[in-house]
């Protein structure tokens, strides 16, 4: 009797998701380093609205969300430009989750505007072949956030 083993192809695009402080960027970097993947990482330090958002979410939510949306779309364009045959790409964000976060943070009027922009931009976003969702208890997340010492995140509460 002969046993047939079917090889599963490697995913070409991996997205890692989860709450802040769970280790998305850490895992993406480890995968990129250990397996020679291309990493596409969130760059929250570039968002000039984030500090104010953490202090008072309602005042800076739309600007913060739109900045991240445009930043992620730029990264998605870079991702799409790379040949599917070159290497595996790993991202510490899932563009489809962006809208879910917006629903929680934006007013109805802001959400209407966000939706119009989102729908226009997301048309060609690739779908990941694999999504890894990380979880951790809230106390672990808060401990990790505190340990990384980002001054913008000092205002976060559970």
Features from the language model and the residues they span:
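Conserved substrate/cofactor phosphate-moiety recognition/catalytic segment
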Residues: 33-71
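Post-Walker A alpha-helix
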Residues: 27-28, 32
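Conserved lysine of the Walker
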Residues: 24
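A glycine- and Lys/Arg-enriched "phosphate-lid" helix/loop adjacent to the NTP-binding pocket
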Residues: 98-158
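P-loop (Walker A) phosphate-binding loop of NTP-binding proteins
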Residues: 19
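A basic- and aromatic-enriched beta-loop-alpha substructure that forms the phosphate/nucleotide-
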Residues: 72-109
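Extreme N-terminal, non-catalytic leader segments
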Residues: 1-12
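Hydrophobic anchor at the beta1->P-loop junction of P-loop NTPases
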Residues: 16
């Amino acid at each position: 009797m002969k046993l047939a083993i079917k090889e599963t192809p490697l995913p070409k695009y991996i997205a890692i998701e989860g709450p802040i402080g769970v280790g998305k960027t850490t895992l993406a970097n480890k995968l990129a380093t250990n397996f020679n993947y291309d990493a596409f990482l969130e760059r929250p330090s570039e968002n000039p609205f984030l500090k104010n958002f953490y202090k008072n979410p309602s005042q800076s939510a739309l600007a913060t969300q739109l900045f991240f949306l445009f930043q992620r779309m730029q990264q998605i364009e870079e991702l799409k430009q790379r040949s599917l045959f070159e290497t595996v790409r790993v991202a510490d964000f899932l563009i489809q989750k962006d809208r879910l976060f917006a629903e929680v943070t934006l007013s109805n009027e802001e959400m209407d505007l966000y939706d119009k922009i989102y729908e226009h931009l997301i048309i060609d976003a690739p779908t990941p072949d694999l999504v890894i969702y990380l979880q951790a208890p809230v106390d672990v997340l808060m401990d990790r956030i505190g340990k990384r010492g980002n001054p913008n995140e000092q205002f976060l509460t559970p």
